[in-house]
Amino acid sequence: MNPSLFLTALCLGIASAAPKFDQSLNAQWYQWKATHRRLYGMNEEGWRRAVWEKNMKMIELHNREYSQGKHGFTMAMNAFGDMTNEEFRQVMNGFQNQKHKKGKMFQEPLFAEIPKSVDWREKGYVTPVKNQGQCGSCWAFSATGALEGQMFRKTGKLVSLSEQNLVDCSRAQGNEGCNGGLMDNAFRYVKDNGGLDSEESYPYLGRDTETCNYKPECSAANDTGFVDLPQREKALMKAVATLGPISVAIDAGHQSFQFYKSGIYFDPDCSSKDLDHGVLVVGYGFEGTDSNNKFWIVKNSWGPEWGWNGYVKMAKDQNNHCGIATAASYPTV
């Protein structure tokens, strides 16, 4: 073949392979870009539009199936709309499911009255939903959430604690800043360091700084160690009921979680072992009288626009769904 003809054919092939967009979605696309302040280069715009459209149509199909009773939760377009699921998992999840020093083991209370529902938000234990940004620091937000709750239980004062302090300063304990970490390592840092600064004094940047700027005079919390829970939902329920919010890790790597909006989250593909995201259980409850409608109230760190005002109801007592009881722990204060 004549080389020039070959190049012409190749270029025509590329042109014909360019994505064809659904013009009926133009207004929604432009609105989404404006809402989330997206500015793309010429070469990226088409690719991102194609990813966004694919996600939009997947969400619409899921919600049609929800209306037919096939799912127990809805999905919605959100800030992750132009990300493939692979990108989403790389950027947003940062729990490192690695071997580490264990804490004390939780001793389940034998005679405690365990209520059918608990919500520590109503008791003042929980700070507003935060946003980790595009930094794999979920572990830090889960850890501060549990420590904020335990400090409130001890002092009666709710103080927002510094995730950036943990991101910058806990590498000696095994954490890797925006590249991931463990809540237990964060609790160990607070004990080793003798304190953790307040959010106000050490604000969140959403990036690695390589410099620890901890100021002892701004410390707003301390801990004496941490306790690991047995890998059972009943143990998690007893801990949440009697102690307050508990740090947990889950498998959050699915598109169904990426675009979760409301209802009780259940995905049959969710793993109880492959954990990638640190979150905070702040309570539990049930809908109606059906025993299958029990849920955990889980605080996420993707901002209040995601999910149920920043929270997700996760299926409870469904064989440790998404591994919610696999790596649960809390700090002792």
Curated annotation (Swiss-Prot):
This is Procathepsin L. The keyword DNA-binding does not apply. Zn(2+) 5 binds at residues 251, 254. It comes from Canis lupus familiaris. Zn(2+) 3 binds at residues 184, 228. Its EC number is 3.4.22.15. It comes from the Eukaryota. GO terms for biological process: antigen processing and presentation of peptide antigen; CD4-positive, alpha-beta T cell lineage commitment; collagen catabolic process; elastin catabolic process; enkephalin processing; protein autoprocessing; proteolysis involved in protein catabolic process; zymogen activation. The gene is CTSL. Inhibited by the propeptide produced by autocleavage. Long isoform of CD74/Ii chain stabilizes the conformation of mature CTSL by binding to its active site and serving as a chaperone to help maintain a pool of mature enzyme in endocytic compartments and extracellular space of APCs. IFNG enhances the conversion into the CTSL mature and active form. Inhibited by CST6. Inhibited by the glycopeptide antibiotic teicoplanin. Inhibited by amantadine. Zn(2+) 7 binds at residue 276. One of its GO terms (cellular component) is chromaffin granule.
